[in-house]
Each structure stands twice: as C-alpha cells, then as structure tokens.
Amino acid sequence: MAIQARRMPEDPSTACEDLKFFEKRLTEVITYMGPTCTRWRIAIVIFAVLVGVIGSKYFANEKIEIFQIPMIDMFLTTHLDFTLCFFVGLLLFAVFGVHRRIVAPTIVARRCRDALSPFSLSCDHNGKLIVKPAVRNSAP
C-alpha cells in the first residue's frame, strides 16, 4: 500500500473555503478565550491593589521595633494580612498559572502566525487571516 503525498487542491475555490473555515475557527477560539482572560485580569488587578494598600500601610509605619522580634513572629502576628496576600499571590501564579491564562490568546495568535508564515499568511491578534505577498527568489 503506497502512501500518497498530500497535494493542494486543484480547485482554488476549495482552498479559499478552507482558509475561510480556518479563519472562522481561529477567530472563535481566540474570542472564546476573551472572557476568561478578562476575569483573570480583573482578579490580578484586585490582588495588586490589595497588595499595594497593605504594603503601603507597613511602609508608612515608622516603628523601628520590627527588628527586635523574630521574622516568623512578625509575619504571623503583626503582618498577618500581608502574609496571607503573599500566599494568595503564590497560589495564583505558581499553582493556577494566572500569567499563562492572561496571555493565552496572544500565545495562540503568535503560534498560528509562526505556523502560517511559510504559506505567506499571517493573522492579527483577533485571528483574522492576512495574506502576505509571496516572496520571489531571483536566480542569479
């Protein structure tokens, strides 16, 4: 049983329909990721504001007696809210991978751009295909 090589279709309208379907599907995938990314961005903004407010509270504190108690006691007694924020941030970034979830549509678009470039195609950040002019190699 011989393996046949895959060829481009002879009919240009079939290739055009395939490109339209690919563009539609890519746009759907990137659009579907949008609301999830927005929710994670809002969570990160709330977390950053919370850390900023709590951190500024301790920077504004002018007490020098911080160095007179052990670090563990300081973080578990006087800075408990900052310690909790630190562990929530660690949970968000290390366990849930929020940073990857936020930039997921950008990663998908960039990888599609890389895969489409040999075919003189590209795509924008929304998944719309862009046809680039074909590169002509001039023989010397």
Curated annotation (Swiss-Prot):
One of its GO terms (biological process) is regulation of nuclear division. It is found in: Nucleus membrane; Cytoplasm. Keywords: Cytoplasm, Lipid metabolism, Membrane, Nucleus, Transmembrane, Transmembrane helix. GO terms for cellular component: cytoplasm; Nem1-Spo7 phosphatase complex; nuclear membrane. The keyword Transmembrane helix applies. InterPro entries: NEP1-R1. GO terms for molecular function: protein phosphatase regulator activity. It is a multi-pass membrane protein. Disruption phenotype: RNAi-mediated knockdown results in the formation of two nuclei in each daughter cell following the first embryonic division. The chain crosses the membrane at residues 42-62, 78-98. May form with the serine/threonine protein phosphatase scpl-2 an active complex dephosphorylating and activating lipin-like phosphatases. Lipins are phosphatidate phosphatases that catalyze the conversion of phosphatidic acid to diacylglycerol and control the metabolism of fatty acids at different levels. May play a role in nuclear membrane dynamics being crucial for early development of the embryo. PANTHER family: NUCLEAR ENVELOPE PHOSPHATASE-REGULATORY SUBUNIT 1. Belongs to the CNEP1R1 family. This is Nuclear envelope phosphatase-regulatory subunit 1 homolog. It comes from Caenorhabditis elegans. The lineage of its organism: Eukaryota, Metazoa, Ecdysozoa, Nematoda, Chromadorea. The gene is nepr-1.
